[in-house]
Amino acid sequence: MQYYPSEDRYSDKMKYRRCGKSGILLPEISLGLWHNFGGVDPYEGSKAKILYAFDNGITHFDLANNYGPPYGSAEETFGRIIKNELYPYRDELLISTKAGHDMWKGPYGEWGSRKHLFASLNQSLQRMNLEYVDIFYSHRYDPDTPLEETMQALSDIVKAGKALYVGISKYPYDVAEKAYKILKENKTPCLILQGRFNILEESPLNNGVLSGCEKNGVGFIAFSPLAQGLLSDRYLNGIPNDSRIARGGYLKKETLTEKQISIIKSLNQLAIDRGESLAQMAINWLLGHHSVTSVLIGASSVEQLKINLATLNRPPLSDQEKQLIQNILTSI
């Protein structure tokens, strides 16, 4: 059956923010395919989530070469959806991918060399059935490769027509400042920085990253807005057997201390008092920062996506509520 997107996908369902000083607008909520879209996940479920997102005004889909599992399979899933459903709407989509983390064996399978970045993007384009991506990121800073080499590769990728814009991900403030300067001199200014930012991890506010983005006219997109599920009702009563902490990986059991549980429970009560879920309040908190261009969410189901998108219909946090959140973080 042929897919036809919702006719009112650009109604008041979604608001869009300017990305730095560029001509690009990003949806306040974007969809990331880090988890739940790999080869181990049912294809029909992945397709349903992506099409629901587009039907509701999400135009930005964020990937990376090694998203899955297995590596590359999230791009393959997305490429299949592009080919079968979304190809007629390619010009309405803003697609990003990244390279820099472990992807293939040998000395050229990761980090920031020119060889790795070009090879990885060529592979990504093939997996996604695309001629170009809208944003290509250096996924992490490589301290062993000259920054000039990495930035020149990004610039040349744009000049080769393989990407329209470039971005950097998880770069420390001082290195990001140098990267912005090189890219500007190359006449391919940095469009966006992607960084971890949420109520429990406020470092971009304090380490200069957010203010640096604003000063340099660079957008900022926040990943891990729910702190890998900690900022939800998932861990209020312990560690569920099917949770990310129970499965291992990035989140460790020692992350969930008694203090952390107390903070999460207090935040959850504040969210209840506001008439929303903790996840919705966490997204709302991020959108309250004018330097945040977009919040990058994941989705394990259409229902979860629907609930998180409903945040856009919620009133913003008041100054008093923001202070209550800070009090919770510092008083427990």
Regions found by a protein language model. Name each.
Residues 1-93:
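N-terminal binding-site loop/beta-alpha segment at the start of enzyme catalytic domains
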Residues 31, 63, 97, 135-138, ...:
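Conserved beta-strand positions
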Residues 2-13, 145-332:
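Beta/alpha (TIM)-barrel catalytic core signal, keyed to glycine-rich beta->alpha loops juxtaposed to Asp/Glu
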Residues 126-145:
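Active-site groove signature of glycoside hydrolases
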Residues 41-53, 112-127, 176-180:
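Short, acidic/polar
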Residues 20-38, 96-109, 132, 137:
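N-terminal small/glycine-rich loop or linker at the start of catalytic domains
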Residues 25-29, 57-59, 87-93, 130-134, ...:
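Short, well-ordered coil/turn segments that N-cap beta-strands
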Residues 38-43, 66-74, 142-146, 173-174, ...:
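Acidic-and-aromatic substrate-binding clefts and catalytic sites of carbohydrate-active enzymes
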